[in-house]
């Protein structure tokens, strides 16, 4: 390789750099590491040097081999991987031989030829830059405006003025079917609001994760339908063309409709790029010559039709080759075609799994929609009048379900459109209802305003075709329709054009032969209407040609039988809309506005379906109770809902969102026959007669939450507002059958508790068991709870665990517990921030209240002194306490004499829970004195994690042979050792030992000890031994 030849090649590489990259190259040239043995070039000489001058300077100062190495290093540093690879691939074989005079002459001629080529390329480069500017201008013009879905001819909206920022997160989320579940977006958003999830910055979308990583070449935007994927892709195009985004990274951005490409004619990638460019004969060859400077925006991967399981041989590698659209895009995605090009792909979650099979490394970004602040911003941007915007936003804020749904930009637009049309017509916003069905009905009727009798008939006939088309698409899981599909359902091209104008359909401007509903939920809405529209006198669908293929079965039983079976959950919203549409008031409204007849015949079938699901033995089947409630809520017809709810003897649902609370409140307040009501978030309700549940309850295993669950619970603060509480609690005073209420884990708070207390004192309230664990209660509500205990003789079980009641709250509570009319039998006060100061009040209750038999005080700092005070009253033979829980109460052996005294005098006490207290061997020795007394009737003793060793096993051995009442002994998580356990085994073999259950969890045994336990179990099958070697 001759020197001049190296100079020409370096100059050509430098010529490929854009102005900004060329400046970066010069900057890095100054910072080139001196340890690499290169001479730095003075800045004065490089500052004004062009490509040839700079190449010459590099070689003159450092020689051709070092100059080549410098260029490679800097290409990598400025992220020009293409030039780095090219320079690496074309690197000469360096020789030290002297160059002859003849060679120098040949080199001089070659240099002149190279310079002439350089001047020619400079001219071409200028033309290229001129075309780049022309293309950017074209993109700005094309993407600066958008058309609202109901825009009239010539109407458009400035994208920059309307666009509202969406929340993007980088973390990869679960692949649940949520494309058509608008409300599920609200749930997802609510769950992560308090979680430390960082938002994604669009400017850094293609940047490497860290300084040691490669740049990102493929980004996937995922989000449900209507969440804003397309509008975000268009905004990226506009910002790039306006020189606000990716200026240093991409020379060209091309926006590709996946739907259009997959359904269009065969073409090459060059043809596809040309279709995105202005004017004839764009420089395709020059554009694709630098694929690393190209970004393809593929919008709507989920709408891409075609197979994606081709072998790699079937893929396209030549940008000039004509192929099917799906082959072209698959080749780009799989990096067989222009592998150095970058991709930004938008898709719905349901297609993500298919996409992942095609991708290599990719950055996944999820679009979560609008935050609360952004929703307000959207309203302000949509309404030109700020006062109108604030009035509309206040209305939706008060309306929780719609406010939640407005996380989704499309729904936000629908709501704003409907409200603005009402405002413009002078109608009251109070008429706007609160369900999805009501919003869609109003939107539909606004678009189908009659224009004379003939227009009414025309709309009515077209409605038939729309509904049958929608239902056919639902059953066949089809969202794209060709003109032949429209004709098969009696829809003419003129009808479709009219509906496009009125925004019931969306027709792609560049792909006129294919149609789709503007949103999947609209298709589901029309599919639901298909089951309600009356047929004509001949029993046939109006306006449907005889050549039409077989229409979907209109039997609603078939629809309900298939509920939940579709992979994409298509039928969930169809059934919800079905319930919403049979509301008699809405039916009359629709019949008047749409000039059609809607049948009410299916009401009985829907009622039977609800009854069958309500009486199902398992709650795990589809649909869940909550989903049934959503259906009834959508209907908003109290008589029907009350009949349906009469089939729910037991309600047990988990609430996750505000919307869940609203829906459950509506249904529960219309329920008259429920016997047990559990609105739970994180806990399971305790069982009346199940020993293990009570033990678990006393141990507070249920209080162990993961960090996420805690954050999630905190994110639900104020969900149970006073108005919601009154709605839910109204059923308590009107339903004599309702005896159990579990609200554990809900943020009830003192205001909600006060509302509940009012209800509990109503004569018609028959609640016997009430669980209020972790409900954000404080001492301020204890006076009202005390009043309930004094006046409600029916309440026998109360759980107030995990509420910061404090000593003062317990003092107030004890006033009611001491009352003559208090019949409470079981009381949980676990983890209520109590100290020994509360024990005086509790002791006074034990000496006067003869109904209380179970008291759980675990997870409170009672200490030895506090327990000593309690024991003075418990040891009274007239105290009826049977079960006492003192788990993790800060006890030592100091309290054991008092406990031993209780055991030797009170024959009513049968269960004592002392886990997590440092009693030690001495404590057990003192306890055994009471346990060996003839008056002791204790059946269950739990001493897990009590700092015991093998020394206590002698005392326990004596206990096991002498005490005839003890049936269960728990010694887990103690250091008893093999010797201690073997001693117990010898005693347990004796016939005089009546123990039925021994728990030795979280303890290590050697082989001999383990074998001894197994042998004992075999020889004495009536004895259950539970042991798990520690790991």
UniProtKB/Swiss-Prot annotation:
Q: Could you tell me which residue ranges the Pyrin domain spans?
A: 1-93
Map the LRR repeats onto residue numbers: 737-757, 766-787, 794-814, 823-844, 851-871, 880-901, 908-929, 937-958, 965-986
Concerning Gene3D superfamilies, the annotation shows:
Death Domain, Fas, P-loop containing nucleotide triphosphate hydrolases, Ribonuclease Inhibitor
Q: Which residues bind ATP?
A: 164, 223-230, 519
In the UniProt record, does the keyword Transcription occur? Answer: yes
User: Can you locate the S-palmitoyl cysteine lipid attachment residues?
Assistant: 125, 832-833, 839, 953
List, for all copies, the residue spans of the domain called NACHT. Answer: 217-533
Query: What's a GO cellular component annotated to this UniProt protein?
Result: membrane
Primary localisation category: cytoplasm
- For this chain the motif KFERQ-like motif 4 maps to 986-990
List-wise, which residues carry Phosphoserine?
5, 156, 195, 198, 262, 292, 331, 723, 730, 801, 1030
Which family does the similarity line name?
Belongs to the NLRP family.
Subunit and interaction comment: Sensor component of NLRP3 inflammasomes; inflammasomes are supramolecular complexes that assemble in the cytosol in response to pathogens and other damage-associated signals and play critical roles in innate immunity and inflammation. The core of NLRP3 inflammasomes consists of a signal sensor component (NLRP3), an adapter (PYCARD/ASC), which recruits an effector pro-inflammatory caspase (CASP1 and, possibly, CASP4 and CASP5). Homodecamer; inactive NLRP3 forms homodecameric double-ring cages that hide pyrin domains within NACHT-LRR rings to avoid premature activation.
Comment on protein domains: The pyrin domain (also called DAPIN domain or PYD) is involved in PYCARD/ASC-binding.
- The protein here is known as NACHT, LRR and PYD domains-containing protein 3
Gene behind the chain: NLRP3
